[in-house]
């Protein structure tokens, strides 16, 4: 476990920035870089500004602005409220989707539903799809997903493939492990 934790430390923003600065010093020691930071790149950009401000010409942040002085718990509380607001807006726009979501939840409680990879589909995984409602076009994407969920009384195989593809931790497992570390300060 200790070796694994040490290895994961290489994926933290400070480690990434130190690697990037080594590359910059090697390739263009006399030319500062310009950065564009989005999501985790925003956190890396802010870390770069903290550690090597003289190595940067300019930094553009489009997302991933660190909540300085705020804990991960505070960020999550604000995020939960935003997701709840987005869910209310989604169901107000697509009222029929609530009945489909309820039907899906009931179906998942009564049946052992498996995704194509063999993983069990749970109500909680289905609820996780609501986290994407902040993205552009997400309302329509989620509605179309729900709309195609059933063929008669059975779940549509195409629906199951789409849900599987939307499970971020299946394809990005390191995100789940490292996510909260981005909120550490000091």
Regions found by a protein language model. Name each.
Residues 111-186:
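Alpha/beta-hydrolase fold active-site neighborhood
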């Amino acid at each position: 476990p200790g070796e694994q934790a040490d290895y994961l430390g290489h994926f933290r923003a400070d480690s990434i920035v130190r690697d990037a600065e080594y590359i910059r010093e090697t390739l263009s020691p006399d030319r500062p870089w310009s950065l564009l930071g989005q999501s985790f790149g925003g956190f890396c950009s802010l870390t770069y500004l903290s550690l090597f401000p003289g190595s940067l010409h300019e930094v553009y942040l489009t997302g991933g602005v660190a909540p300085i002085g705020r804990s991960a718990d505070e960020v999550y509380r604000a995020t939960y409220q935003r997701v709840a607001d987005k869910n209310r807006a989604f169901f107000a726009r697509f009222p029929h989707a609530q009945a489909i979501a309820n039907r899906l939840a009931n179906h998942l409680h009564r049946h052992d539903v498996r995704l194509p990879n063999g993983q069990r589909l749970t109500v909680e995984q289905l609820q996780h799809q609501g986290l994407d409602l902040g993205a552009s076009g997400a309302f329509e994407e989620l509605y179309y997903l729900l709309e195609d969920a059933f063929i008669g009384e059975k779940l549509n195989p195409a629906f199951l493939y789409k849900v599987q593809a939307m499970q971020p931790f299946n394809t990005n497992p390191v995100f789940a492990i490292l996510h909260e570390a981005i909120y550490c300060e000091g």
